[in-house]
Amino acid sequence: MAKKIQAYIKLQVKAGQANPSPPVGPALGQHGVNIMEFCKAFNARTQGQEAGLPTPVIITVYSDRSFTFETKSTPASVLLKKAAGLTSGSARPNTVKVGTVTRAQLEDIAKAKQADLTAADLDAAVRTIAGSARSMGLNVEGV
């Protein structure tokens, strides 16, 4: 018989840097999950990713206090800011442009995000990422 699911916890944790401090500790502690076990497993799974990039994770907590988790790819906004060399997007994206990204950069981001996107092919994924870039106040070249 399958285990009974108690809760789903969604967090963004920096790759390779999970530790028991907030937000990880309180979120897992209130469901009775072994926090250090999660931190070690998460850090091991995200070892190949660039350290410090926020990684969305969905933790499934079962009634016997065991857990499983699934990591997603880094949010597109973080990858776009990194590609454009910015610390934040524009406060007024339709009037004030703060940077530029090229189609090649968008293709790299789309390839990294393709597993999490619902796009049918790479070109559709690039257009999706380009829309995110425009909404952040970035100029998009070549799309």
Swiss-Prot record:
It comes from the Bacteria. GO terms for cellular component: cytosolic large ribosomal subunit. CDD domains: Ribosomal_L11. One or more lysine residues are methylated. Forms part of the ribosomal stalk which helps the ribosome interact with GTP-bound translation factors. Part of the ribosomal stalk of the 50S ribosomal subunit. Interacts with L10 and the large rRNA to form the base of the stalk. L10 forms an elongated spine to which L12 dimers bind in a sequential fashion forming a multimeric L10(L12)X complex. This is Large ribosomal subunit protein uL11.
